Amino acid sequence: MNIRMRSITIKKCLVMLLLIISSNISIAQDCLDTESYYQYIKNNGQPHLEYVLDKIRSHSVVSLGEDHWIDVHPQFLCDLITASAQDSTANIDAVAVEFGSERYQYLADSLIKSPVYREDLVFKILQYTPDDLGNPYKEYADVFKSVWENNQKKPENLRTRILLVDPAYIQDYFDGKDYVYTGSRDDNMFDIIRNYIIKRSHIVFYAGASHTLARINGTRQGDYYYNWPSAGFLLKSCYPQDVFIINLWGGQMGSKGYIENNQTRWNLIADGVIDKAFQKNGNKPVGFDLKDDFPLLRTETYFANPTIKLSNYGEKGSPYAKEQKLSDICDGIVFIKPVSEFNGIQLINIYDNEFIEKANKRTKGSCKTAEDILKTVKEWHPILQF
């Protein structure tokens, strides 16, 4: 190779190297400094219940994103319902929950109208949730009870309704029946909640974070991605001034529940950098907005999970961009208490004979009793407690 050709080759290599370096620099790096998060929380935080009540006063929809299968988040919802009932300026017109099929909305309405608490109606609702064997969870049942009990203390025009927002056809799908697809689960959530925004009502939308956050979700199918908008994305896109999205702080979630860790009990988000900031703040329950000056935390880091890989960030067709920040899909955070103090949700027997027979068919004969069902649910999610 002559000197001229060698010089051209070297120049090309240098150009390629500069392009690679510049592309990496263009993706901002996460802030992994506990002190920065602590100062932000100290300067911007307020008591967690009052924080959410303020958002209810100023928005039609306040979305609360929970971690499934743990006790603290639905317990917080119960506390919020009680606090709202004591302040008519922050009254909740309806609580929209993921754990209930719209097919059984009449049961939720019957509960609200009943002069006595009807646990049988609640258990019936929890049998027909978007899980094959229902949601036999005490803390979910407590949400219904909290709404009913607090309604007894309020005038009828201020009573809170419970909205069941999972589409009806899901139950037919579980049973192997023919069904009419009416849209995704997120589409259905959006359709129901939108009707209340139009009425200028105040709604608390409580569901898993994959539904409440304003993001596009996706899974790889064959050679490309199947992407769909979350209910939070649809709500925030259509009504940006009316919807406020809060994520409830928690641990690192796997497909079966929180991921165990010998040092911290559960794997912590971003290796515990922000949890240490909460600790430095006295582990006080706190809520705060994710403003422009919130230390940078990318969604890839926030949702990092060593046990599963749903989609590659930055891959062609993937809805997950490496540069996407948590503040792009979420408006605020509520910290309740240290994640190490979180426990699995408590299993309870909600099953009647009709559903046990249905569950036995759904599991091809492996769930013949309520005890069999609870044992199976526990096997699916070992974090759950008896």
Q: Could you say what each language-model-derived stretch is?
A:
Residues 1-33:
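Bacterial Sec-dependent N-terminal signal peptides
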Residues 27-386:
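Compositional signal for N-terminal targeting/processing segments
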